[in-house]
């Protein structure tokens, strides 16, 4: 029997990347410009290039003094990530990018194009410390937290890709590598930059941003108090503590009732419906009684402010589990809905290139 991966809340103390423009608040940015001999008004110019025009190279910012561009680049725009590999599938509508960071750490992001929108699945950590046994990322362990700049620049890169195609990046989901609420301050700062209008941010609606969590109950409550209107997605995967202690090890610290209570607090504070993520695993969590229990618990805890997103389990190397058959999915959905809770099956994209939920592993040789 394989040794269980340990649960890790605190990221290893490893060197963070060089300071980037996106890491700094306006006061720190102005101070940095002052040290370069540049006046305060240059901040707006640089911000409009980065967030509005999606440019990250000051050498192309022609409204800056020519002699200062290299200095601005060196001080505020270090190269945070370089693409190692880009793979596409689903008729080129899904694109997974493997990035190498300054210290050799790897991470992945996934851009999904739909007829009516485009969604970027971004990472908040390199690896993940939550140790969920059915998730490739969780089984790989946690390397380190990402910086604000490393999170934000994933968005800028994807937005630039969409712009080059004549489109626009419309949705962001923090469902890539890592537990977003375990890198709380940086994720919240990144969300604010993603959602603020130019020149302070990319101008993506807060309602078009989803922050996922395995159920760090205190952090869910803290996020509610930020008074943002992002969607909260809770990776529940089973309604009973006995199984969830195994499937989602963090449940040993914050059990189902506590997680749902925190989710209710978030729904009340934000006015938003909470999304419940449920990876359906054959003969593990797909039983009729679990569907009934799920519907009952969610209806009691969240009333009309909840929606279940059923995810057919995506295959991962060496996994002993596989997806429940379609007939089982359909019956599970029917039973949850019968308890008064909306439930749909997620349109899974990117399976063929290991870009779907639970498949991101950032392997350089893959």
From Swiss-Prot:
Residue numbers binding S-adenosyl-L-methionine: 178-179, 212, 235-237, 314
The enzyme's E.C. designation: 2.1.1.192
GO biological process terms, semicolon-separated: rRNA base methylation; tRNA methylation
GO annotation, cellular component aspect: cytoplasm
UniProt subcellular location: Cytoplasm
InterPro entries in the record: Aldolase_TIM, Elp3/MiaA/NifB-like_rSAM, Methyltransferase_A, RNA_MTrfase_RlmN, rRNA_lsu_MTrfase_RlmN/Cfr, rSAM
Coiled coil stretches, renumbered: none
Recorded superkingdom: Bacteria
Binding locations of [4Fe-4S] cluster: 128, 132, 135
Domain Radical SAM core: 114-352
Alphabetically ordered keywords of this record: 4Fe-4S, Cytoplasm, Disulfide bond, Iron, Iron-sulfur, Metal-binding, Methyltransferase, rRNA processing, S-adenosyl-L-methionine, Transferase, tRNA processing
Enzyme kind, highest EC tier: transferase
Active site: 108, 357
Pfam families linked to this entry: Radical_SAM
Catalytic activity: adenosine(2503) in 23S rRNA + 2 reduced [2Fe-2S]-[ferredoxin] + 2 S-adenosyl-L-methionine = 2-methyladenosine(2503) in 23S rRNA + 5'-deoxyadenosine + L-methionine + 2 oxidized [2Fe-2S]-[ferredoxin] + S-adenosyl-L-homocysteine; adenosine(37) in tRNA + 2 reduced [2Fe-2S]-[ferredoxin] + 2 S-adenosyl-L-methionine = 2-methyladenosine(37) in tRNA + 5'-deoxyadenosine + L-methionine + 2 oxidized [2Fe-2S]-[ferredoxin] + S-adenosyl-L-homocysteine
One of the record's GO molecular function terms: tRNA (adenine(37)-C2)-methyltransferase activity
S-S bridge residues: 121-357
SUPFAM superfamilies: Radical SAM enzymes (SSF102114)
The protein's required cofactors: [4Fe-4S] cluster
Cofactor note: Binds 1 [4Fe-4S] cluster. The cluster is coordinated with 3 cysteines and an exchangeable S-adenosyl-L-methionine.
Further information: Reaction proceeds by a ping-pong mechanism involving intermediate methylation of a conserved cysteine residue.
HAMAP family: RNA_methyltr_RlmN (MF_01849)
Family according to the record: Belongs to the radical SAM superfamily. RlmN family.
Function: Specifically methylates position 2 of adenine 2503 in 23S rRNA and position 2 of adenine 37 in tRNAs.
Protein name, entry field: Probable dual-specificity RNA methyltransferase RlmN
The species this protein was found in: Corynebacterium glutamicum (strain ATCC 13032 / DSM 20300 / JCM 1318 / BCRC 11384 / CCUG 27702 / LMG 3730 / NBRC 12168 / NCIMB 10025 / NRRL B-2784 / 534)
């Amino acid at each position: 029997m394989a040794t269980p991966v340990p649960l890790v809340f605190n990221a290893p103390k490893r060197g963070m990347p060089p300071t980037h423009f996106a890491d700094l608040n306006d006061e720190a940015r102005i101070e940095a410009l002052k040290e370069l001999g540049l006046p305060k008004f240059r901040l707006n110019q640089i911000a409009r290039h980065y967030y509005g025009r999606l440019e990250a190279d000051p050498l192309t910012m022609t409204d800056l003094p020519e002699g200062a561009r290299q200095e601005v680049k060196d001080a505020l725009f270090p190269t945070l990530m370089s693409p190692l590999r880009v793979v596409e599938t689903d008729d080129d509508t899904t694109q997974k990018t493997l990035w190498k960071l300054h210290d050799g750490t790897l991470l992945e992001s996934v851009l999904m194009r739909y007829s009516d929108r485009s969604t970027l699945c971004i990472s908040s950590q390199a690896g993940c410390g939550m140790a969920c046994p059915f998730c490739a990322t969780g089984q790989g362990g946690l390397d380190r937290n990402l910086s604000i700049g490393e999170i934000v620049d994933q968005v800028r890169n994807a937005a630039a890709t969409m712009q080059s195609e004549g489109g626009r990046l419309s949705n962001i989901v923090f469902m890539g590598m890592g537990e977003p609420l375990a890198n709380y301050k940086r994720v919240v700062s990144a969300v604010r930059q993603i959602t603020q209008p130019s020149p302070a941010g990319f101008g993506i609606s807060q309602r078009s941003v989803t922050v996922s969590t395995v159920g760090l109950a205190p952090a869910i409550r803290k996020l509610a108090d930020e008074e943002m209107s992002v969607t909260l997605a809770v990776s529940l995967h089973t309604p009973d503590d006995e199984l969830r202690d195994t499937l989602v090890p963090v449940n040993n610290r914050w059990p189902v009732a506590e997680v749902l209570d925190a989710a209710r607090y978030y729904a009340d504070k934000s006015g938003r419906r909470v999304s419940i993520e449920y990876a359906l695993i054959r003969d593990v969590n797909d039983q009729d009684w679990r569907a009934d229990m799920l519907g009952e618990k969610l209806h009691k805890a969240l009333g009309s402010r909840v929606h279940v997103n059923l995810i057919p389990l995506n295959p991962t190397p060496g996994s002993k589990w596989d997806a429940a058959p379609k007939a089982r999915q359909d019956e599970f959905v029917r039973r949850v809905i019968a308890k008064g809770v909306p439930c749909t099956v997620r349109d899974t994209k990117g399976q063929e290139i290991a870009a779907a939920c639970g498949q991101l592993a950032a392997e350089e040789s893959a």
